[in-house]
Amino acid sequence: DAPYLSKNVIRDEPLHGCAFNGAMTMSSNLKDAVILAHSPKSCTYLSIQTISSAGRRTLFERGNILPSSLIPNVLSTDMTETDMVFGGSENLLATVKKILDSPEPPPAIVIVSSCPSGIIGDDIDDALSLSTERTKIVTVKAEGNLTGDYLQGMLMAYTSLAKQIIEKDIEKRARTVNVVFEKVVARNTEMNFQRLKTFLARMNISVNCRFLCNTSYESLRDFCSAELNLLAYRDYTGKILEDFFIKEYGASFFEKQFPIGFKETSDWLLALGKHFDASDEAKSIISENEIIYQNRMKLVRPKLEGKKLMIITYNHELDWILNAALDCGMKIVKICVLNFSQDEGFRSSLSEIDGIEVVENYDRDERSSDIKRLKPDIILSNYEPVSEQSCITDTIPMCPDNGFFTGLEMVERWSRLFSKSKEGEWLNDRKLFDKYYSR
């Protein structure tokens, strides 16, 4: 039973990843639980590669070690051909008992089923009877491609863990919030959380549970103790989770998602400050950062004013960069939104873009003719495109940084790009650059 479905499952599109992998990734963020994959070694191995990707990337790029990402809390039943023929339930139960008999058993064992265990009909719910006072057994019937894509597995983990762990009858704690739906694979997730946590601390607001990101069994169990829930992303999945928690637990959600850029961050702080009677502190934070924002914007405006910007992106919310572009006097000539499996429906609260051409489900084949017709000075996209002879290109992150200066930092980069020449110190190397890079 999966009442909350991914776009791929609803539209019967080719799958993007498998449900087992998505469920494993999200479940592993319950950091003090053991995540038990009822699968062959190969399936577990692939999931561990996904789970550890952010940690490995951080280690290689910055030299920082994130043990929770590099050494995930994952075990496997290591299903064999014998299990596939005669059934793997005995193997599963034996593995669970071995974990329970360890010197320090975890508060929870989350069992996730895979394609092989689903195909042969192993019922992982058989292990529920092994729960003890110290350790709760939780099951997620993901069953790989049999159930759906990666996002479907995420949704199943979200809802299954919530229904089996969260206690409804629990006392509310004043000035406490939960954070819902952070993007766990994005490398800036922890940095974004810490930045906004600093703002919350200044307004005397504490965080209980991060659902589901680097959190604990106890904080998830006490989810309903929070006074308010903060949604990190109000996209397709974020809105599903908001709807789920409202229907299942009567949860209250803050109307704004995590803010990106100066205007969104200011509005977010003012609204949150009003809710928690901390308006003075919110205004103080905004004033401190507004001075910095305006002074830095003055430096880039002379170089960017009047420049034409064209955007081709999978992102469905762009107000943070549109605001920054408008603040420095740029002209936005076209916004092209590509079809994306994780979101749908372009969203903007800016009246300033009413006269701007916005195309959803943009056809990439129109790119060349649009560039020739609109003659943009800069093209913004999610990927590094083929070199354009007539303009500068730059990339837009799928998961931008939160806070006041996200859009500002991007337009500052554009300003530096316009100040540079491809020729640089190599003088005539521009011909070689154009010849080979444009292929």
Predicted features and spans:
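An N-terminal assembly and electron-transfer interface module characteristic of large anaerobic redox
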Residues: D1-R439
